Amino acid sequence: MSALIFLCAILIGFVIYSLISSARRPKNFPPGPRFVPWLGNTLQFRKEASAVGGQHILFERWAKDFRSDLVGLKLGREYVVVALGHEMVKEVQLQEVFEGRPDNFFLRLRTMGTRKGITCTDGQLWYEHRHFAMKQMRNVGYGRSQMEHHIELEAEELLGQLERTEEQPIEPVTWLAQSVLNVLWCLIAGKRIARQEDGTLRRLLDLMNRRSKLFDICGGLLAQFPWLRHVAPDRTGYNLIQQLNTELYGFFMDTIEEHRRQLAKDPSPAESDLIYAYLQEMKDRSAGGESSTFNETQLVMTILDFFIAGSQTTSNTINLALMVLAMRPDVQEKLFSQVTASVAAASTDAFPHLSRREAFDYMDAFIMEVQRFFHITPITGPRRALWATKLGGYDIPKNATILISLRSVHLDKEHWKDPLEFRPERFIDSAGKCFKDEYFMPFGMGRRRCLGDALARACIFSFLVRIVQHFSVVLPAGESPSMVLLPGITLTPKPYKVQFVKRT
């Protein structure tokens, strides 16, 4: 009996200690809401984020409440620090100590149960594969003339599609996404997917869109309490995520196997792409007998990372730009006047590639303002402190998750004066030239800068110039698009319709 009493006392003592320690704030940790034993701020965070319209808004409210550009909280057992404001955001993005990625259930679920790819890895694996992937993507034209050629073909295809609508109201987002995805697919797989081809393109887009809506930047309840997948796999979205992961993996593997068969027939294909280059690297390393991290799963995750980085945010930005054009005819006509003049000054067959953007200052400024105003990636991908360090005078524990609020920089009232006003002129100087403001950072900064920035900037610019040049974007009678975006890892506009009226 005494032994039983002793064991009960030990158990009770452990529970009390666990309750106290789980609610204790680390010494000199950034200010934030009080921790609830065992749960941290998880339930409070989810409830308040839903009430105010998103976690990015909640972080800014907490920063104001606690009068700090660093907010410290605890989600489950994970310490989280949110960096807000230009100074803190810039410092986090440029310091090596914050280049890590968290290793948690949420991020492994995003990468199909692995810790592979580029975006969600760190250390030597991240450095080696980012370097290889970016080098090979440049070799096949990423950010160069070959990519411009693919953009030109897709832009002309898109114009034809819009003309065939015969000015009927349409939701443009799917058509835009198909065009952007095809440019990326040409670089990755060496071919485009025809829009009429057995629904493959639409199916892939649907998979990507459905998958992105199942995540938020903190991973939802599954990130803090992974065991919930065993209790409520449907309600937590776990089963659906697994289904979508399986379908995406199958789609990518089919393409990889097709490339493998082609390589077996011709070891030196005339047209290269990322998949060919990767398979060749796998073969070379295997022949050399060296231990290698180059494998099929890593290739699949790399493809997925480029898709996420380069396709959805790009098409959503163009979609938002078209919505603004329809809502602001004054801005649209000013853009049309400059586009017409700039195109007339060039040769008649000169396509408006990004390399010519200096002739389109107002368009360049307009695009920047769309990115600043809507900030579709309000919180960038989570970082991890690689070692214990200091930030803003506070102690940051090793392995703490760091979230970066780009929205707080893009809507900084002290800097922008009128951040809630849509005004492209803020990016035009006294000489009438477009300039980049230091507070403008839609793709992030440093070595963790977005993988898809070159594709995004080129597609957004060229597609918009061509659309404005050939069409008036008009709201149908009774249509009133919402400026409030839908939440997710990236923010997206609510469905809306516009008419594309051919200019004469």
UniProtKB/Swiss-Prot annotation:
Binding positions for heme per the UniProt entry: C450
Subcellular location, principal: endoplasmic reticulum
Protein EC: 1.14.-.-
GO molecular function: heme binding; iron ion binding; monooxygenase activity; oxidoreductase activity, acting on paired donors, with incorporation or reduction of molecular oxygen
Domain of life: Eukaryota
Keyword entries, A-Z: Endoplasmic reticulum, Heme, Iron, Membrane, Metal-binding, Microsome, Monooxygenase, Oxidoreductase
InterPro entries: Cyt_P450, Cyt_P450_CS, Cyt_P450_E_grp-I, Cyt_P450_sf, Cytochrome_P450_fam2
GO cellular component: endoplasmic reticulum membrane
UniProt topology in membrane: Peripheral membrane protein
Pfam families: p450
Enzymatic class: oxidoreductase
Localisation per UniProt entry: Endoplasmic reticulum membrane; Microsome membrane
Cofactors that this protein relies on: heme
Family: Belongs to the cytochrome P450 family.
Described purpose of this protein according to its UniProt entry: May be involved in the metabolism of insect hormones and in the breakdown of synthetic insecticides.
Name by which UniProt lists this protein: Probable cytochrome P450 305a1
Species: Drosophila melanogaster (Fruit fly)
Encoding gene, per UniProt annotation: Cyp305a1
